[in-house]
Regions:
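Iron-sulfur-associated redox domains of electron-transfer enzymes in respiratory
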Residues: 1-190
């Protein structure tokens, strides 16, 4: 996130981003690592459930965590769409947890929660409209966050560091590598 401000990766920490988001006015700020763990646990369970069918047909089960990939399969290879996992992406998984478990934990009506994700890919915006779901209400790209920082006259080099809110505990290393190439498979194998 700090590249557009000319910040080194050592200085542009997630904690500095959190501090900037709090200054903008976000009430709670979470890391989606835990949600990536939940997604991979769901996909792993589904894989084990489907394993007899997979062995018989020789066809794989595909991850469903990338909306661009899901849309590609459904539009270009509709005969393979049944091979997609039914698990929600980490973004959507966390939105659902926010509006159920976390709302209850805070004693807040889920309807009063407006859940915003910050994602590097614009396909995540489209994902929020699928199946009538409103687990995530809005998605900001990292470029849009940069513009927000500038609109609020936030200078990252002047920010301290702040911690993420911790709704369910820490995520694992598997959740951290989820977004890297091959990360979903490595997380599943862990």
């Amino acid at each position: 996130w700090g590249e557009s401000f000319g910040l080194s990766k050592d200085f542009a920490t997630a904690q500095r981003l959190v501090a900037g988001l709090r200054r903008i006015g976000f009430d709670y700020i979470f890391d989606t690592t835990f949600a990536a763990d939940m997604t991979i646990m769901e996909e792993g369970s589904e894989f084990l459930e489907r394993l007899p069918e997979i062995k018989e047909s020789g066809l794989p089960m595909f991850t469903s965590c990338c909306p661009g990939w899901v849309k590609f399969i459904k539009s270009q290879f509709p005969d393979m769409a049944g091979r997609l996992s039914s698990a929600k992406s980490p973004q959507q998984m966390f939105g659902a947890v926010t509006k159920s478990y976390y709302a209850e934990k805070l004693g807040v009506d889920p309807e009063k929660i407006f859940c915003v994700s910050i994602m590097p890919c614009i396909a995540k915006k489209d994902e929020c409209t699928w199946d009538g779901g409103k687990d995530v209400d809005a998605v900001l790209t990292t470029r849009e966050v940069e513009r927000m920082f500038k609109a609020f006259f936030i200078k990252p080099e002047e920010l301290g560091e702040d911690e993420f809110d911790d709704p369910l505990g820490s995520g694992t290393g598997a959740g951290v590598i989820f977004g890297a190439t091959g990360g979903v498979m490595e997380a599943a194998l862990r």
